[in-house]
Amino acid sequence: MLTRPSSLSTLVMVAMGFCLLPCAGAQIDAFHARFDSVLHQHGIVGGGFAFVHGDSAATQFFFGDAKQDSHKPVDANTSYNWASITKTFTAIAILQLRDRGRLSLDDPAVRYVPELRQVHDAYGSIDDITIRELLTHSAGFRNPTWPWDCDDATNCDWQPFEPTKWSQVAAMLPYTHIAFKPGSRWSYSNLGYVFLGQIIERLSGDDFEVYIDKNILKPLGMTRSYFDRAPYFLEADVSASYLRAGDKLTPQPFNFDTGITTSNSGLKAPIPDMVKYARFLIGDKADPIYDVVLKRSSLEEAWTGVLPAVEPGQKPNSYTSGPGGSQPMMGLGFFVLQVNGHRYIYHDGDQGGFSSELLIDPAGHSAGILAVNTTDTGAPQPATLHPESNTEPDANTDLRQTIRNELIENVFPAYAQQPTAAQTK
């Protein structure tokens, strides 16, 4: 026999309890429909998404084709280039080395990469630029790895776009200058993360890719993740990629090597492997595997905003806004976004037609993971072929912003009150 609740608060709690799972399920179903609609609207050839909540089974759904010419559908094995989300792995590697006593974040970068002494710094000594400033994009280095770009396909015949060797980057350092007083403001720099990759290699004695595999991918069980070109047994699952300009769809080079820029944009992985990464980021603090990869206190340090992640005079875009015009701060390799007093952590990625997002709700133990294989330039003119560029058009800004806002405003709140399996034990 049912008894009457002893108070209104009890009645509300019971009602919430009955609603938690159905309400959350309804929100993810509505999000799935919105996801399909947004990708169709932007002419995306193929993509995938996963939602992770605690240690519950991930919700995954897939859209369109991995390869348009053969109509090979996207599935759980499809591998994407995660582009600048790689920077979060690089930041974790630097923090690992710090926690192991190999470096301090306030060490001068030139101590580990002496070639930087050739850079022109009109604001002081190059010795004043720290590893911390490289992590927070506040060291004053330019964005692209090369100091120039090609403006059309005709002028790009000297590609591949990205340098393949450190010696090519080092040769440009005497012609590189610091653009502003280091530490004074934020300016996104792919080049800075190339230098961080060099620090990891020189301290560990391993190639960057080998270090990340040993210290992050393998411990987390990310067995289908890799750098550079796909190993033979995974080639069939590599997604093609495209630039779209109106009705014109331009295929991008397939299975490309990101060269010396691998530490800022080289990670390739399927959605399920990125689910494993997301579980690490939102995981149970009591699970010993997380301290093996990175102490939770160090991860929280990375998720602490250091300075506004906005260029002077910059208009809001996918990197610099959230719901209600909220503006992010830059942490150590991660962006930190406060929306109505609630903290979200994220990073985007764009390269060679691929576009991606990793969005984390630490307090709610939830994460959203997005990857698509098409960059919608929003331009009516033919798309420029930029095979491996980090400076191609600001890709899929509206798409990512829409997905991010849907998660923050609707999906994450629906799951925030739903206990994880670990919490119910």
Segment roles from a protein language model:
Residues 65-67, 121-350:
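Short, surface-exposed loop or secondary-structure junction motifs
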Residues 28-80, 102, 118-119, 174-175, ...:
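Short, conserved catalytic-motif segment at the N-terminal edge
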Residues 1-12:
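Bacterial N-terminal signal peptides that target proteins for export
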Residues 35, 49, 55, 79-106, ...:
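Active-site SXXK
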Residues 105-121, 218-220:
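Short, glycine/proline-biased beta-turn/loop segments that scaffold the active-site neighborhood
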Residues 10-20:
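Bacterial N-terminal signal peptides
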Residues 259-268, 343-378:
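Glycine-rich phosphate/pyrophosphate-binding beta-alpha loops
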Residues 306-319, 370, 375-425:
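Short, gly/Ser/Thr-rich active-site loops of penicillin-recognizing serine hydrolases
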